[in-house]
Swiss-Prot record:
One GO cellular component term: cytoplasm
Description of how the protein assembles with itself and partners: Interacts with translational regulator CsrA and flagellin(s).
Described function: Acts as an anti-CsrA protein, binds CsrA and prevents it from repressing translation of its target genes, one of which is flagellin. Binds to flagellin and participates in the assembly of the flagellum.
InterPro entries reported for this sequence: Flagellar_assembly_factor_FliW, Flagellar_assmbl_FliW_dom_sf
Top-level lineage group: Bacteria
Source organism per UniProt: Syntrophus aciditrophicus (strain SB)
Keyword Chaperone: yes
Keyword Cytoplasm attributed: yes
Similarity section: Belongs to the FliW family.
Keywords, sorted A to Z: Bacterial flagellum biogenesis, Chaperone, Cytoplasm, Translation regulation
Cited Pfam families: FliW
The protein's name: Flagellar assembly factor FliW
Main location: cytoplasm
GO biological process per UniProt: bacterial-type flagellum assembly; regulation of translation
């Protein structure tokens, strides 16, 4: 599948890499097909690119790189909708917000994207657990982020 994106230009995505979301991302419910785009295998930041709208993409990161003890409770309804039979098939991503001041880099730990990596199905869940902040300060807590290394988030073709 080929798609024209505002950040990466024309990209080609294999059908086997398409992740389907029944409800989309909160506020972007019309986008149902996504793909994870890697800038560099060493860079922890990825792009969650909509394949329905080339202008819609989110910077995401594995929450375990930010909080090694991140343990969100996923309810049975979520596991059933995503057809998760094996816990090893679950991948979690959280959306990163980048404001005009890069020092204000935050991650939403309260609403992770839950992915069934085996079946390429996903949904965003809103957790009721207040231990997980909506605006987790990445730079303030960077000692957890791959040993404190800094990485650039750029919109160059993967």
């Amino acid at each position: 599948m080929k798609i024209s994106t505002t950040r990466f230009g024309m990209i080609e995505i294999s059908e086997s890499d398409i992740i389907l979301m029944r409800r989309g991302i909160l506020g972007f419910e019309e986008s149902k097909k996504y793909a994870l785009l890697y800038q560099d295998v060493k860079n922890p930041f990825l792009w969650f690119q909509s394949l329905d709208d080339g202008a819609t993409a989110f910077v995401v990161i594995d929450p375990f790189l930010l909080q090694p003890y991140y343990q969100p409770e996923l309810n049975d309804d979520t596991l059933e909708k995503l057809e998760i039979d094996n816990p090893e098939d679950v991948a979690l991503m959280v959306i990163v917000s980048i404001r005009s001041n890069p020092v204000l880099l935050t991650a939403n730990l309260r609403a992770p994207i839950v992915i069934n990596a085996a079946k390429k199905k996903a949904c965003q869940v809103v957790l009721e657990d207040s231990r997980f902040p909506i605006r987790y300060d990445i730079l303030k807590n960077r000692e957890f982020l791959l040993g404190g290394h800094c990485y650039e988030i750029s919109a160059t073709a993967p």
